[in-house]
Amino acid sequence: NIGFDNFTTDYVIPVEVPHRAKDFDTYGLLFKGQSKNLFFLPDHDSWEETLRFVAEDNPLNWFKSLEADIVLLDGTFWDEKELKDRPQNKVSHPTVKNTLELVEKRDYGHPRIVFVHFNHTNPLHYPDSSEFKKVIDMGWEIGEEGMEFSI
């Protein structure tokens, strides 16, 4: 376990987020660059719980409050039907489908959102899938190994 009590830096800022285990803390990381900021959030609870925890009403408003230009975002599951043998409420992650409903189509001034951290069952692994196409058509991105970000 890594504790962030009294951890300070001007360039990497831990941002606490709720997650299913109550025995330890979960954090996203905000990297402050010379020209842009990148928020890495590969794991958190439902949007309802996370937004309540950070006192925001929408993911985009939260990202704006963090001054995030690029967001690497939890894309573990496409939807709640993805796991055949386990109910989705037992595996706390917001679905990409739910995230898209909240952020809608990318508009001027919105951060660059890149979905990452995919479960092996997620159809976003396949560029020819309708789900992959939907994310791209809405102006968002699918992370791929080796991507680099300049901040």
Region locations from a protein language model:
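Core dinuclear metal-dependent hydrolase active-site scaffold
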Residues: 1-58, 64, 146-151
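Cap/insert and terminal regions of metallo-dependent hydrolase folds
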Residues: 37, 45-146
